[in-house]
Curated annotation (Swiss-Prot):
Organism phylogeny: Bacteria, Bacillati, Cyanobacteriota, Cyanophyceae, Synechococcales
HAMAP family xrefs: OMPdecase_type1_B
Binding-site positions, substrate: 16, 37, 64-73, 128, 190, 199, 219-220
Assembly information from the UniProt record: Homodimer.
Broad EC category: lyase
Name of the protein in its database record: Orotidine 5'-phosphate decarboxylase
EC number annotated for this UniProt entry: 4.1.1.23
Catalytic residue list: 66 (proton donor)
Pathway the protein contributes to: Pyrimidine metabolism; UMP biosynthesis via de novo pathway; UMP from orotate: step 2/2
Keyword Lyase on entry: yes
Keywords: Decarboxylase, Lyase, Pyrimidine biosynthesis
Listed GO CC annotations: cytosol
Function, as annotated: Catalyzes the decarboxylation of orotidine 5'-monophosphate (OMP) to uridine 5'-monophosphate (UMP).
C-alpha cells in the first residue's frame, strides 16, 4: 500500500471554468485537496487576489498561465508571479532555451525579493488536446508528438527547469530518461467512466502514476461528479493500491 500522504500530494485539482465562489465551495466539499491549479480563465477573471485567497485556505498553487513570449517578457512575468507565493508556474518550452533560463532566474529573484520560497518552473511540452493528426496538420509538423515532447522536455531540463508538463502517454518515456530528479506533471487524466471532453491523449490516474507521473492535474472528473469528495476518495484509493 502506498503512503496516503504521498497520494494526496500527487493530485492537483483544476478549478478552471469555476468562479471563485464555486471553487471555494468545491474545496469545502473536498477538504483533503492540497494542490489547486489556477488557469488563465480564473486568473484573468479574479486577478492576483485569487492566489491570496487560496493561500489563505492553506492550498498549494499551480499557477498555470503557460507564459510564451520573448525572453524579456516571459522573465518579467515570472518575476511578478513569483512574488505572489505560488508553488508552481508554467512556461512554454517552445519559447526557447534563453526564455526558459531567464524565466527560471527571474522566478528565483522575484521570490527572494518577497522573502518567499521560489516556485518550481515547469515547461509545457505538447498540449494534451492535440491528437497526432491535428498536431501534424495544424502546426505543420512532420515528426511524432513523442519526438516533439522529447525535444521540449530536454530543452526544459537543459534550462534547469524543475520539470515539464506532458500527457500521460509520454510519462513513461520521460521517466526512463530523467529518473526521479525531474517533475512530470500530467493533465489529460480521466476515470474510466468519464467522457474525454477536449482531451485526446488521456489515461486513468492509476495508470499515469504507475508510468511515473509526479503529479496529476484533475478537473472535471472531480468537479463535475455528483459527489466530488467521493470521486476524489476513489482516485486516492486507485493510486494507493499496488
Amino acid at each position: 500500500m502506498k503512503n496516503r500522504f504521498n497520494s494526496e500530494d500527487k493530485i492537483i485539482l483544476a478549478i478552471d471554468g469555476l468562479d471563485l465562489n464555486q471553487a471555494k465551495l468545491l474545496l469545502e466539499k473536498c477538504p483533503s485537496i492540497k494542490w489547486v491549479k489556477v488557469g488563465l480563465e480564473l486568473f484573468v477573471r479574479e486577478g492576483p487576489r485569487v492566489v491570496e485567497i487560496l493561500k489563505g485556505l492553506n492550498k498549494k498553487i499551480f499557477l498555470d498561465l503557460k507564459f510564451h513570449d520573448i525572453p524579456n517578457t516571459m522573465s518579467a512575468a515570472c518575476f511578478q508571479v513569483s512574488k505572489l507565493g505560488v508553488d508552481i508556474i508554467s512556461v512554454h518550452s517552445s519559447a526557447g532555451l534563453k526564455a526558459l533560463q531567464d524565466s527560471k532566474k527571474a522566478s528565483l529573484e522575484g521570490a527572494s525579493l518577497a522573502n518567499l520560497k521560489p516556485p518550481f518552473v515547469v515547461g509545457i511540452t505538447v498540449l494534451t488536446s492535440f491528437s497526432l493528426k491535428d498536431f501534424q496538420t495544424d502546426l505543420d509538423r512532420k515528426n511524432s508528438i513523442e519526438d516533439n515532447v522529447l525535444r521540449l522536455a530536454k530543452l526544459s531540463f537543459d534550462a534547469e527547469l524543475d520539470g515539464c508538463v506532458c500527457s500521460p502517454w509520454e510519462v513513461k518515456m520521460l521517466r526512463s530518461i530523467y529518473k526521479n530528479n525531474f517533475e512530470l506533471i500530467t493533465p489529460g487524466i480521466r476515470l474510466k467512466i468519464d467522457n474525454k471532453d477536449d482531451q485526446n491523449r488521456i489515461m486513468t490516474p492509476n495508470e499515469a502514476i504507475d508510468n511515473g507521473a509526479s503529479k496529476l492535474v484533475i478537473g472535471r472528473s472531480i468537479s463535475k461528479a455528483l459527489d466530488p469528495n467521493k470521486a476524489l476518495i476513489e482516485i486516492f484509493k486507485s493510486i494507493d493500491s499496488d
